[in-house]
Amino acid sequence: MLVPTEAPASIREMVTAAAARYASHPAIRAAGFSPRNWNAYFHSMIQVESGFKVTAYSSAGAMGLAQLMPGTARFLGVDPRDPVQNLDGGARYLLMQLGAFGTPELALAAYNAGPGAVRKYRGIPPYRETRNHVRKVMAIYRNRLT
């Protein structure tokens, strides 16, 4: 997980555009997010996932800004190497988790560890990486709102 403090303007614009495409999604309202909060939340997740690096590649095989796994990208019908499609897939997948689990923290845990792990543990799994991921994203998110 990379966490630089700022993204290049072109990347910020792509992340903002991806978030804006889904600003009226029912899961956003159900979680209590305004469009501004959703945008800050999505930016924060991308910051932690990839450090805003289009070419980010994890040892597990996750790719791009939203760090999509190949199987998830196929499921979503996106090319994970294309930054616009990667972000679109990441936004949709995060919204699926938000809709399924109802809270920002559980959605992040499901995005990181998989929805099966969140169901199995009935909450954030006890994996250090996942707990750190959720903590980092939420801290950056809260900071973006101030």
Q: Where does each model-flagged region fall?
A:
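Catalytic glycan-binding domains that act on GlcNAc-containing polysaccharides
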Residues: 1-146
